[in-house]
Structure formats: structure tokens, C-alpha cells
Amino acid sequence: MSLELLSKLETKIQTALETIELLKMELEEEKQKSIGLAEQNQQLSQDLNSWNEKVTGLVGLLNEEVN
């Protein structure tokens, strides 16, 4: 191989490595977002359950008052 071809190959390899590093960083960011969204989802589910219990209790009280 000529030096020119080796230089082009080296450039392409360097570009590929940089792209891989950027993709790894993006993947890590997305993983962190996913973890945050999972935590938020869990909190919202707990809030929903709490509200459902409160509403069920209030409906029960209303039913007792009606009867």
C-alpha cells in the first residue's frame, strides 16, 4: 500500500473511532434519560394510586350518605 492510501485509511479509522465515541456518549445520555423517566413513571403511578384510593374513599362516603 502507498503512504497516501495508509493516510486515508488512518483518517477513516480515526473518524470511525470518533463517531463511535460520540455514539457511546449519546447512548449513555439516553440511558440516563430512560432511568429518569422510569423513576418519574413510578412516582406518577404511586400518585395515581393514591388519588384512586382517595376518590374511592370519597365515593364510599357519598354512598353511605345517600343510603
From Swiss-Prot:
Main localization (coarse): cytoplasm
GO BP annotations, alphabetical order: division septum assembly; FtsZ-dependent cytokinesis
Keywords: Cell cycle, Cell division, Coiled coil, Cytoplasm, Septation
Any single Gene Ontology cellular-component annotation: cytoplasm
Coiled coil: 3-59
Family as reported in the entry's similarity comment: Belongs to the ZapB family.
Oligomer status and interactors: Homodimer. The ends of the coiled-coil dimer bind to each other, forming polymers. Interacts with FtsZ.
The protein, known as: Cell division protein ZapB
Organism: Shewanella woodyi (strain ATCC 51908 / MS32)
